[in-house]
Amino acid sequence: MNKLFYLFILIASLFILTDASHFRFGTISWQPTTDYRTIKFTSNFAYRTTFFYSSTSSIKVGNLVNVGTLNFGSGVGSVTVSVTVTDFDVKNNWFTGTFTTTKAYPAQNSGTIREYTAIFTSCCRISSLLNNKDASWNITTSVQIDNKNELSMVNWSPVSGMIPIVQVVANKNNNFRVIASDQNVQNADSSALTFSFSKVYTMTQPSGMTIDSKGNCYFLPTQIGLYSTQIYILDSRGAYIVVDFILQSVAEPGTCDPTCSNAGTACNQNSQCKGCTNSGSTTIDTCTTSNYPPDFVSPPTPDDGDTKLFPIGASTSLTFSCKTIMSGRSTTIQTANLPVGVTTKTPVTGATSNTTITWTPTTANTGSYVVSLVCSDSTGLTSSVRSFTILVAKPDCGNGGYTESGVCKCVDNWDPASKCFECKDGYYGENCVAVPPCVNGVPNSGINGDGKCLCSNGWTGADCSISSSQSCKDLSNSNTSISYSNPSFVNPTKVQVYLTSTPNYEVPTIVSIPNPINNLDVYVLVDANLASTTAFGYIKSGMSTFVSNIENICETAQFGIGYFSDYTPSPISFSPSQVMGSPIAAAIGLYKPATYSTTSNGNSLLAATDAASASVGWNSGSFKVIVIITDSDHSSSSAQITAFTNKFIGKSIVPVVVSFGASSMTNWNSALTSAGFGSVVTASGTSASDWSAKANTGVKNVLSKIVYKSDPTATGSSFVSSVPSTVTVSSSSSTQQTVNGLKLSLPSGTTIVSPVATISAMGYGQTDISINYNRPPVATSGSFSVNQNSLATFKLTGTDPDANILQFKFTTFLTANAGVITDSNGKDVSKQQSNYYAASEIFTYTPFENYLASNTIRFVAFDGCVESNTYATISITINKVNQLPECSSISSTITTTLNTQSTFSMTATDFEDASPFLQFTKPTDLTAYGTFTYKGASITSSTKITTGDSVIFTQTVNPKNDATVTLEFRAIDTSNAFSQASCSVSFKIQHANVAPVSSSTSPISVIPRGSVSLTLVSTDSDSTKALFTITAIKNGNNGNFYTCSTNDCSCTSGSSDSTIISLKDQFSGISYSSTKANKLICFTNGEPSAISNYASISFTSTDDEGLESNTVSVVVNIVGDRANVAPVVTKIQDYSVYQDYLDSDAHVVTGTDADIDDYNPPNVNNLIAIITTPPSNGILVTVQNGNNVATQGNAPFTHYYRPNPGFKGTDSYSYQVMDTFKETSSVESTTVTVNPINHKPTLTVNSYSFTSQSGAGETQTLVTYDFDGDNVLCSVQAAPKQISMYDSENELITTLPKSLSSNSYSFKLLDASKISPTPFSSFSDSFIISCKDDSKLTTPYGVLSTGNVTGFVQFTYINTPPTTKGIQVELDQDTTEPFTFNGTDIESPSDLKAKIYALPANGQLLNGNVVLTSKLIGEETYELDALSYKPNAGLSNWNTIDNIGPLDSIPYSVVDQQGLVSDSDVVTFSVRPRNPPVYTGADVIDVLQNTRYPLNVQGKVGNGGSEVNIQVLKFSGRGTLSIAHSMGSEGTMDTEITSYPNSQTGSTSYNFAYMPPHNEYGNDFDFIEFKLFDGDLYSELYTITVNVIHVNQPPTIQLISYKVLDDTSKDNGEVLFDSTYIVNMNINTSVLIKYTGSDVDVDQVTPLLSTVTTALRGTLYTKDETVPDLKGSIIDRNHTTVEQSSDGYYYVVYSPVPDSSGNSYVRIPFFMTDNGGLDSPTLTAVINVNRYNIPPFVLAGNKTYSTTTKLALSVENVQFDDPDSGKSNNVSIVVSIVGENDENVASLEDIKISLKRMQNCELHTSLASISCLDTKSALNESIQTITVNAVTAGNYRLKLFVDDLGYNAPSAIRAQSHMNATGYVDVTFEEAETTTQTNDNKTVLTGAIAGAAAGTALIAAAAWRLLRKAAPPTDTFFSEAAFLGDGVSSNPLYEQSASAAENPLYQSASDTTD
């Protein structure tokens, strides 16, 4: 059963694959040939066989199949791909084919490599693919054109292959390998390949598939079906290929492995097997099967990945063997991608099968070939894919050559200079045969040549012996000058003939028709108005038989189909349906005619004419026939019959008319008899088989003979004197013969320009004859300009239709004062008025000095026989040259003063302008110090300042020191031309002195009869010395302020070393240190007891420049008075600390005292602790981490010991205690042991600078130090952002941190373009380094780090010269081509100019319309894209020696904006001697409304061209334009073109589909603009006009808007309907609804009828403008129509039932009816009748509160109410403290706020704001008491903001319906009383509130976090007014929120998301 199920799945999947699209597999490889730019491409593709053939057995190895176009890369052309079939698989319906071609790429400059991307792409992939279905395939490879390396070292691409369809098992592990070979076999170091999924074009890789870098694929497909994959294969030199193939996933039932817990259980996939040993493996299945597939036998079969060498010239064979172990089964081997020429034999079949391949490669086959094999058994099971490489190695000597003494000896005609790989001169092709004669040209020789003669300029013919450029007098006989022969039944297809007066010049033609015929196109034109549905049914059912009958005549026949209708009331002349190559039997099966009638307007002949005129996808080189099936004769006029005949002749189409049931076809018989071609057959009309058989007979009739006709509409028809007689086509053998009888004669007196005669061999093809005869030449007008006081050169040009050599003669000359024109000999042409000048003559025009007027001269052309009929004009324009302005520098420096205006002016002069302007280059250098204005506006780098006008600079910035700023400026004239030199003005920005600030400690205390010191302090940032002045002094009764000469207070007041301080005493010369100057003074007293405010002293300080500070006062208080007993000190026990670290334990100096006033623990301890002897090797500090030295202090006196840096050992200090009477205790000492520790190392990082020209920076070494002598190891923690940093080994630092082995580093700038923010500029950057030691100490810690140290690096950018590279400009003959010089500059790539050193020899350079002269190029530089090249008339690449070109070249350099010049290089001009393709289709198409139109665009190859490609440039876009892909029997697939231009290549006929937009029509409806191109040669712009023909359509209706009436709560404006058609109105109001209808039909002339269904609730009225409420008549079941208003709209008024409301209250349907009775779709308005939402309000009992800081303030009785909020819905409030006059929220550092109840509230983290969300009762309880506590005094307001969240509004508009209110309570906090008050508290508070303004938005965020838990967020609620506005905001109920539609689901109250 399992096996049967497996076979069913396998067969089903194969069936699906067979019925799919056609692409299966593809890969492209390449290799250079005899030179670096000639590349040989080898492509392998696989397709579905039945897409190209009628059955899988019809294909044969060696068949040629055209599969598309290979594009060689952007701008270098393409080639049609015709693969040679190499393998095919009958069972799986695919074949593989190989295509080889050679492409010569444009030459590269020496030392350069250019990469192109070759691509083979088309649509569409298989529709049933599980990934990438219906997508385009893109097979690409990167092609390297390498002119840098020797040819032997030039890269070859990889090569790969695969079976087109690889079978895999679903839900199981599938492992296979993609094999590829690196073709660089001539190199000793063959590069490795890497594999990955392709990302060249976007595609989806199979889910569950991976690939490693070696090409091993692992795939566990989870679905049964087809997958596509593309593998990317890259070699080490950057060349890649892809291999694209299909994976077919099939089911394979099995049982679980014995190691599984459910062993033996039936399974279909690995995941169904549980607990297995190999679970999760990517290579071993746990669901196994005993149904084993076949496998290859090795040997003889090559192993996967093997390489087999096939020597050149030797026959080599390989055998493949496959076997199965399953009894009763046989095996077969399928190969893929065999090289062309390999023969295959299969001598053995059965359980074991063998296949042998044999091949004898030639030198042309050099390279690698990846061949793939798969083995399948008779049940459909397949082996894994086996792939190997066939290597044809390139020998030392090719093509039979041999080596003798190290030199190649060649046989036959091979060239030893190429080691026998290239032909000798004069030989061509793979066999090096002799080239045919080539008289005046160069033969296309070489191994890749075709032997054709490439003629030199002026010669033509097969051997280039016929002159095509000569004087007319040299031609005396008629001759055939050019003949083109394309693949066709009739040859030649194009002929060029020169006719003289000799009559009846004969042009021979050849016919070659195979039997059976190989190309047949049949277009079926069906009458869609037959007599009955039964009759049309016969046509449908017989179409398949007809197709089969025709395919019996030609197996590859293609079909198209279209329709016409002869229904008299509404006939249709022609409507195309399917283009050529379509399944017409299926198409007609879906077609439904609109009418069946026996009446006819007889338009079948007109329909046939239109069908022949249309582009229906005819294939080039096919026999073309239109089969017209109709049941009525035509009734056309004679003019229409003539038009029919001419159209069929012009298109070489033959008609076959099938009379379907008609008694006679008299008119058709007559028309075809008169025409002389075509066939009429009669069918019964009652049988499908009869008409199909008769139609087949008609086609055979027209195939049986060749009827020649001359197209009378061709311009050269009058030149045809006779055509050949009818030729009979053999029915049993091929017909090949030369046909005579085509004769031409020159009509007398003809003036036809470029006549072309068309001779049609009806159906089989046609010959176009371009006829030349001597006609007058045409002189070509031109113009040029020359700069004032300069000169210009020019040539005279003209054209001759016969390519005769031209001469020219002047007919008018310059006026006397205009200047002089001289010839190349310097002679004035006005003195030689009868001279003829050659076309190569160069004339020079020199205008007289300062002559500026325009002038013209005239001339005629002469071809040797006649002059041109009209003269041509040369227009001369003299360009006035603008003189640059000049500016003047300001010599004196402008000195500025702070906050003072400085006014100055600048001057400039200009030759043309009286008042030029001036502009500053960089005014920001000055505006950094103040304001810089002109006429009141700030000056920028674009400000234009009139010369002499004043500008003002006001210094507002006080620099630390005086600064000098120099500004550059330039003059600019009215043409925006700048002065060549810059000028300057300098400013001295002066520093302004700042007054000092005085300070001191106050009050200070002193004991009775004691002394105390105090310090006078002055602070100043810009002075060096201070002067202190005593401004007031109060000594007390027994006190004195004094100083000691020892600068301390150790002296006694009144002693010789003391000085008493008096009023106005001064202390001068006090130095500032760290901005502070200190003066120590002393105070002593003789008082016996304590006295408060006993003494005081006031002082100021003055700086160096005399600025005086504020006045500071110091108050002295006297404390203490008693009897005393000496205290006792307490000893501190010895202790230890760590080296260099403060002791972590506090130590205390204290003692005891018998005096209770001094010592009474725990309440009194007035002892003073004194350090009598400080430690010798350390210090004592009072705070553990502080710096204050512990000398004395109140006992207990806490101190910490800090050893001196680096000290270790023992130390000691002594101490005692002193009581308040200065009695001291004895002295005690304590010993401290300092234990050694590890020290942190130090690091110094020096700044470094370098430039862009210094390359890599010099190595920098870090400066490190370790106190302990440890090693210091450093690492980079952060590298510079813009500079590359390298480690000690000079390796780029890419990961951080990075160790520096020798503590050194260096820098290098990799890419100056990435400097940010300004590329190519100088900048500073930083980096961070940290170091650590390697200490062995561990206590108290081990290894220590320096921490992060920042270093700085300065990069200076130095401008570099630009660079250039030669370019090749390609253009068409006789055209002008703009081009762009190739220049690059890393600093300013967009600001380069070109400098030209010489003019082209064979053409002109144009700057606009000005022809460049040697004078111009000597003085000017040009924008890179400013110039165009125009070759001289008639010249092209053919005029060069090798006929390849280029025609011209010029040397040039580029100059950057700094004037640096690049090295010179060359622009070459390659002029193509070809004509573009020509569009042959209709310019206008008629498309039925709402109907797809198959648009086929056909073109003809231009004379001398090779391709017809199309580029759709523009589409007007009202409809849809798509590319139509023919999928064979599957019909067509349309892919919309979404961007333009859109290009297609590889055919002469391109299929599109046009679809008009729904219900739109009209003439000139859409426009399609396109060009045809051949390579990069483009045709003129073609435009197809699309007319969309009207088909009657129903009307449409549109609801416009509504307006609520009777509602006074809001502005009742007009509201536009959205797509929901919802009306929102309030209770007890009415609404006016406005709507309209439209009809696309032009016959709808009366207003549409509006019908409205009666409302189920409420009342509907018509609108009556005469009554106030607008309510007209009631609309009920008897009155449902609404008349159109005078403004063109329709109106109804709706009123709901009074006092009722609700969502979706009522639905009102509307529809329209046209005057034909068609109804529009119905639109329904949904009425929501809503309740009113009442705004909340705020109440406050007391609106003013005041208190002092640091006291809590309770605000009571602040409440709010929302009338329509209930007990359950939430309301939002925000309680905050704001400023007195603004809405800025105060900071928590200034004021704090709290509520009585904080549940469901959130306090802001930094601002005085609380956000709450709860019911209104709960919130009112919360705010019953609001507590406010201010730190900073000031006037505040308590603000309560309430939002009702719109809960009373309907949910649909709740987001827009929030109502809110705001209330305030004033709160004032006075400053608590203090001894001093130096600042205005209000000022401080204002600053504090202003500083908190930025936090206001954060309060909104806090409210949002609460609110979003229970309410939908809206922008109305969270607008700025919600938090900052005063009072109740305006009602937002009817304001549309911009984000109203973005309403998220409510979140639960537990949501804590921020």
Curated annotation (Swiss-Prot):
Residues carrying a glycan: N138, N354, N479, N1348, N1382, N1628, N1678, N1742, N1770, N1820, N1860, N1881
Region forming the signal peptide: 1-20
GO biological process annotation, one example: cell adhesion
Keyword ATP-binding: no
The UniProt record lists the keyword Glycoprotein: yes
Disulphide linkage map: C438-C453, C455-C464
Cytoplasmic topological domain: 1905-1954
Cellular compartment(s): Membrane
Side Extracellular, residues: 21-1883
Location of the VWFA domain: 521-706
Membrane topology per record: Single-pass type I membrane protein
Top-level taxon: Eukaryota
Family recorded in the similarity comment: Belongs to the SIB family.
Subunit annotation: Interacts with talA/talin.
Name this polypeptide is given: Integrin beta-like protein C
